[in-house]
Amino acid sequence: RGLAVLEGIEADLQPDGWRLGAGEGADLRRARSLLAQDLDTAEELGGTFFRALKIQVAGPLTLAAMVERPRGDKMLADHGARREIAESLAEGLRTHIADVRRRFSGANIVVQVDEPSIVAVMTGGIPTASGFGRHRSVQPPEADALLRMITSSITDAGARPVMHSCAPDLPVELLAGAGFAAISFDLGLAKPADVWAETFEQGVDLWVGVVPSLDARVSDAEIASMIETFFSQLGFDGDAYADRLVVTPTCGMAGASPGWARTALSLAQTVAARR
């Protein structure tokens, strides 16, 4: 999905993953076609009924860690390539958001930028092509610059940028400073700390990932209690976060059964409504 949005960069799916190429490969054409079909279906079924609509893409750091250069190894290995993919994503998002806004003119658009690899990228945890080494870590100033390209393009297009990652030890201060309006995270991996409280006080919303992504026995009361405990440890009572609370699954739901996906979304709605 992230590659389907890129502007001016073509790629093809190889046996070992996506690789940049001279032209648009069949798999990238298919990805772009599926994206258009998804929007067509949503427009047909939802039309003007959406008050808010969330779209999502892989972020620049994660893309750089996943996509290979034409001659091999990840784009992460090259400073210029990292910047190129961020610029391409920023430009592509402007076009993508404009298309979504044309289809859903009355909706408030939220763009979720998925960065599951951000911690590994910034701590030197991404293996090289040989598997015997690790790519150098991307330092905070560069990570900030790359993410700012994305948040600026989203904001300029009239949408709301939200960062999502299920990784532990997120660089919360960096994300807040990069222009994200909200941070979506796995509550089970977040340690209550001053940085979360400071971020929330600065106006960055916290999207609390607390509903299990896979089938589980849990009640809305138990989920609500976990949220209340977290915010209480940060020094906030219910009134402080009631109007800013967004309840989400802990991480992606690709592995969930259809039945649990429905249950999880229902639980999230019920818990959010309790406030």
Give the location of each predicted region:
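Glycine-rich anion/phosphate-binding loops
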Residues: 27-43, 83-96, 221-229
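Catalytic-face loop-and-helix region of soluble metabolic enzyme cores
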Residues: 181-274
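Active-site-proximal loop/turn and secondary-structure-junction residues that shape catalytic pockets
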Residues: 59-61, 115-117, 167-169, 189, ...
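Alpha-helical structural signal in soluble globular domains
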Residues: 45, 103, 149, 153-157, ...
